[in-house]
């Protein structure tokens, strides 16, 4: 199967819709089929009344791929979405050709709720105003109960336990100024991957795919081409 025939599936982060994936998706769409999903209960996707766990969100993405007739894809995720995609890559390795984790949460050495919330708030000040406005709108659309419940689900998930089980070649990417995932955490996560590589985008925050879509897309293209034989 040619590289160009394998679609890209983009999964958003915590309490935000897929809208902030558009700058990256637009660059991808010049040559590839691209799908930017809204997870259940976020953005334009209706969700169940209960809050879904990370494994349940991964199952939902797998079911969506099956319904869409997508047998394999290049998975790209940010923040919370990295946990969902890591779980998916372990549960259904045959569906994932390559995996790109942008600003994965959570720092394996800092699972404490207060520590992570403080880091998220600190990073939010480095994000563009338009993105913060987008997040605020999506927060209220998702609702307080789902926002808090999903945040708790993210903190209770230990991505470091899944990383060694991922067979797909994995690109881990972070913005240099991302306070939610220090360089030490990114290096530790990369070392847990069987086929992992780390790329750092200079001067960028947590949502580096939004602020630096060109650099992120170039890194993803290089990653895909390395494993397109």
Question: Where are these predicted regions, by residue range?
Answer:
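Conserved HGGG/HGGXW glycine-rich cap/lid loop of the alpha/beta-hydrolase fold
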Residues: 1-44
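Conserved acidic catalytic loop of the alpha/beta-hydrolase fold
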Residues: 55-73
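Flexible "cap/lid" loop of the alpha/beta hydrolase fold
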Residues: 83-91, 95-127
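Hydrophobic, aromatic-rich cap/lid helix
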Residues: 133-161
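Short beta-strand/loop motif that positions the catalytic acidic residue
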Residues: 166, 172-174
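Catalytic histidine neighborhood in serine/cysteine hydrolases
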Residues: 190-207
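Catalytic histidine-centered segment of alpha/beta-hydrolase-like enzymes
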Residues: 204-217
